[in-house]
A protein has these predicted regions:
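Extended, charged low-complexity regulatory segments
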Residues: 1-167
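P-loop NTPase Walker
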Residues: 2, 10-13, 19-22, 129-137, ...
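Short secondary-structure junctions and interdomain/linker hinges
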Residues: 26, 33, 164, 168, ...
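Non-catalytic, well-ordered alpha-helical scaffold segments
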Residues: 64-67, 155, 166, 217, ...
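Alpha-helical nucleic-acid-binding subdomain
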Residues: 128, 196-388, 393-405, 417-419
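Catalytic cores of large soluble enzymes that bind and process phosphate-bearing ligands
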Residues: 149, 153, 252, 298, ...
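Conserved helicase motor core of SF1/SF2 NTP-dependent helicases
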Residues: 156, 205-208, 217-243, 248, ...
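Short secondary-structure boundary/capping elements
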Residues: 160, 190, 365-368, 488, ...
Length: 552
């Protein structure tokens, strides 16, 4: 193939005209929506409709509706939203099954397509791939996106999703995904775009039934624009602490699960019952208790089963049996159970380790433990159809169980090399707990190849459980390692500030709060950091990295 620039094989005037028709169709639809102003059931409905219309108009004025095209026997334009007029599909929603060819077709497998066209920033700059002949014209939109300066917010990657990412985004709605991805591989992109894809493709899921959990407010601010850009602003994005309350090391210990089993068993005291003139033998009471205890339902519901079994067997009113059986199977709320579980002597009887008892009795509360107790004694409804957890390597077993209870579908994404909590399961163990095999992504899209290579070497040197990164973007800018003073640190920051818009200085006091966020350049003050924290801090850099080691 010649290295000479080739004339694009796409009619630019035709593309402009197609885009104009699509925009006209959008405006016509929005005009129709605006025409129903005042037609809601009440003032609140009117206000909501007006807000939706205004927000959509503003979005369409800012966003390029169409970002690419695939051709079979006719051109099909791909965009953020599907647009049709008079039965003609002007734009195909990127989430539609047919649009998968835009992301996954290749020269080895064209998927029945003749051509793929990507708009690189504007309709005048095209990247054209002739899938039948292997000819390419223009510059890759992916490389252009990766080379740009990083802003203070993550951008939607809908125009540049790669084949491996798209395949994970489009997994069936009922699939459980556990994704181990190294830094810069796009695991967060996969999670957020999967959320938007699920709303479009699973009629059981509305945006209000999808939950996105992130590690921190800093992370949520960073990704806050992605889902609104994809048209799904109503998906709840929050932290685990905000959802359930803070967790503690002592309250996260997996030993609690066996201890709670023993606690429940200790509450049962089968004995002979007298209900009015009727005597119920201890053996019958014990058999009913055993039958009810085997049900995977909360304590209060098992107690109802227990009393109902005895009532039916002896021709009694269930309410009378319930009153008589208060000492045999006591009613117990989650709050009452938690009060009992504050007793060190009881906890020792239940077999909790001494350090867990000491930590727990000194802790004010624990969100995940309280949720576990509430689920066992009162029940927790499945509020969401799908939960997507970022930085999921830090979930404790109790936190994972809490997320599972709230959602019928689950996507976990993270990086075991960035595990910060002692009780974090890690993604391999989380996958085993869920009964699935973890997927893995290793291509370092976001960062330079030099930074990826430095991270690989650092992880190998210190025995960090990291995905081995594959760098695809060499820049010729080596990672700088300095040994020295605060003055050198300040000089490095000043130099990078002169070249990049978004520079971070990360030290031991705030390293973990930067998890999931990215910057153009990073200066790592390694003083007081362990190797894992250095890895985390260094992996935030996209283009340049300076590591300042303390003088020995």
């Amino acid at each position: 193939m010649s290295d000479e620039p080739r004339t694009p094989t796409v009619d630019l005037d035709g593309e402009r005209a197609a885009l104009a028709r699509a925009r006209d169709a959008v405006q016509a639809k929005l005009g129709a929506l605006a025409a129903i102003e005042g037609g809601g059931a009440d003032a609140l409905a009117d206000e909501y409709i007006d807000a939706v219309v205004r927000g959509t108009i503003e979005k369409l004025q800012q966003e390029l509706v169409v970002f690419g095209r695939i051709d079979d026997d006719q051109p099909w334009r791909i965009g953020l939203y599907g647009i049709d007029r008079d039965g003609e599909q002007l734009v195909v929603d990127w989430r539609a099954p047919f649009a998968g060819g835009f992301y996954r077709a290749g020269f080895d497998d064209p998927m029945g397509l003749a051509r793929r066209v990507s708009y690189v920033g504007s309709i005048d700059d095209l990247f054209v791939e002739e899938l039948a002949t292997g000819e390419v014209t223009g510059s890759s939109p992916l490389l252009g996106e990766l080379a740009r300066s990083r802003g203070t917010e993550m951008r939607a990657a809908v125009a540049t999703l790669q084949s491996e990412q798209d395949a994970l985004v489009r997994l069936p709605p009922d699939a459980t995904l556990v994704l181990r991805g190294g830094p810069g591989t796009g695991k967060t992109v996969v999670g957020l775009h999967r959320a938007a894809w699920l709303v479009y493709n699973d009629r059981r899921l509305t945006a209000g039934r999808i939950l996105v959990l992130g590690p921190s407010d800093r992370f949520l601010r960073f990704v806050s624009a992605v889902l609104p850009t994809l048209g799904e602003a109503r998906i709840l994005q929050t932290t685990f602490d905000r959802l359930l309350g803070p967790s503690t090391a002592a309250g996260s210990d997996p030993a609690w699960l066996d201890a709670l089993d023993r606690f429940e068993a200790s509450l049962l005291a089968p004995a002979e019952l007298r209900v009015g003139l009727t005597r119920i033998r201890e053996a019958d009471v014990a058999a009913a208790a055993e039958r009810a205890s085997g049900r995977a339902i909360p304590w209060r519901d098992r107690r109802k089963v227990f009393t109902s079994v005895l009532a039916r067997a002896h021709g009694l009113a269930a309410g009378d049996v319930s009153k008589a059986a208060r000492d045999v199977w006591p009613p117990m709320s989650a709050a009452a159970a938690m009060r009992r579980l504050r007793s060190p002597s009881l906890l020792r009887t239940l077999g909790l380790p001494t350090d867990v008892i000491a930590g727990w009795t000194a802790a004010p509360a624990d969100g995940a433990l309280l949720d576990e107790v509430r689920a066992r004694f009162e029940g927790v409804p499945a509020t969401y159809g799908h939960a997507i957890v970022d930085e999921a390597q830090d979930l404790s077993l109790l936190q994972l169980r809490a997320v599972q209870r709230r959602s019928t579908g689950l996507t976990l994404v993270g990086d075991d090399a960035q595990r910060s909590g002692a009780h974090g399961l890690g993604l391999r163990r989380a996958a085993a707990q869920l009964g699935v095999a973890p997927a893995e992504m290793a291509t370092a899209y976001r960062m330079s190849a030099e930074i990826a290579d430095w991270l690989n070497a650092h992880a190998a040197r210190h025995g960090i459980d990291a995905v081995h990164l594959v760098g695809i973007r060499p820049t010729g800018v080596a990672v700088r390692e300095l040994v020295g003073s605060a003055e050198q640190h300040g000089t490095a920051i000043a130099e990078l500030d002169g070249r990049w818009a978004n520079v971070a200085s990360i030290g031991a006091d705030d390293a973990w709060s930067h998890k999931g966020v990215e910057y153009d350049a990073v200066v790592v003050d390694a003083a007081g950091m362990d190797p894992a924290a250095v890895y985390l801090a260094a992996s935030r850099a996209a283009h340049e990295l300076v590591v300042v080691h303390p003088a020995s």
